[in-house]
Amino acid sequence: MIKPRIIVTGATGKTGNVVVTELLKEGYLVRALVRREDGRSAHLKAHGAEIAVADMSDAERVADALKDVQRAYYCPPFDPYMIQGAVAFAVAAKEARLEHIVGMTQWLASPSHPSLMTRQHWLVDRLFSMTPGVAHTIVRPGIFADAYLATIGFAAHLGVFPWFGGNSRNAPPSNEDIARVAVAALTDPARHAGKSYRPTGPELLSGEDMAKAIGRAVGRSVRFVPTPTWLFMKSARMGGMPIDLLSNIRYYVDDHSLGAFELGAPTADVLDVTGRPPEDFETIARRYAALPPNRRTFGNWVREFAGLLLAPLVPGFNLDRYDRELRRPFPSDPQFAPDSKVWRREHGIADPPAKPAASAHEKAVSATGRGQWLESQ
């Protein structure tokens, strides 16, 4: 019996690549949708995937890519035009009579978040759930282990783990576990249609916990160092992160400090959906530590030390001006995820204990501060 053809968007990305590989192992026909052909797409083609090239906002090319496809893994491009791409995909999915979409979204997705990307994730989730005749499964991880391990080379060579999460914790999942949850949903729509899953690691970890795990992975003592947001943003820019992503990520630093990623974590979703326990952070860290750029060599040490010296000198982006020039919409009452009643209700998070009523003076101070914050946007 011929198995369904499944299209994977973002097929050369962190989860898409694994989704393609796992589906091919299980004998599915896989069409990998990529923005351009390169060595990564050639690798997927060599392993048996069909390659389709399309910009996600190009409605006609996306419609062509979905011909003769029955199921889809949808990982949206993280750019300001996410909604354009999602609408193009939903229209094509309806015309192609897709059976099932497994959509990658965010744990933070909510309608009044200050991040445009996060508000768009919330809308995309609803768009696919409303697409007639197409079943929908949501995969909504928090910050991946991959994000924390972006600095493992720094830790390996200089013994320092930069931390931007304040006193909060997270149970970060691996790219592989997130992808395996998506694959399980794609291969059994009857079981997973209409459901939402939050892949996590097996335990909540603080910055200090992660530093110790990384130290064991790289074979040296590593201490975590709280990093101010301005330095984190400069380092991210130096690492090649584009301004449109940084404009959103600055808010996730605040969400992290507010404890958004420890709420409701860890979950049993990876085990329940895939039948395998999630990878622990140290196991993931050992895999990253073994990569050539992170191995402890003199050349790598020079690169990391130079990065340490240069990061504070990198000019920062004016993110508020960028948002204004693009005329980005902004909610009238912006709320980080833990402060949003809608987010808490939709994610099964109990409301925090009621705070004592504020005095007139406290209300005045709060209103003044909020007004200044909004004006800065």
PLM feature spans:
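N-terminal cationic amphipathic segment used for targeting or macromolecule association
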Residues: 30, 47, 362-365
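Oxidoreductase cofactor-interface core, primarily capturing Rossmann-like NAD(P)-dependent enzymes
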Residues: 1-43, 57-60, 67, 78-87, ...
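Short, conserved active-site loop motifs that form the nucleotide-linked donor/cofactor pocket
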Residues: 48-50, 136
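A hydrophobic C-terminal alpha-helical subdomain
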Residues: 231-377
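N-terminal Rossmann-like NAD(P) cofactor-binding subdomain of oxidoreductases
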Residues: 43-46, 53
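Cofactor-binding loops of NAD(P)H-dependent oxidoreductases
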Residues: 54, 227
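Catalytic metal- and UDP-sugar-binding loop of GT-A-like glycosyltransferases, i.e.
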Residues: 75
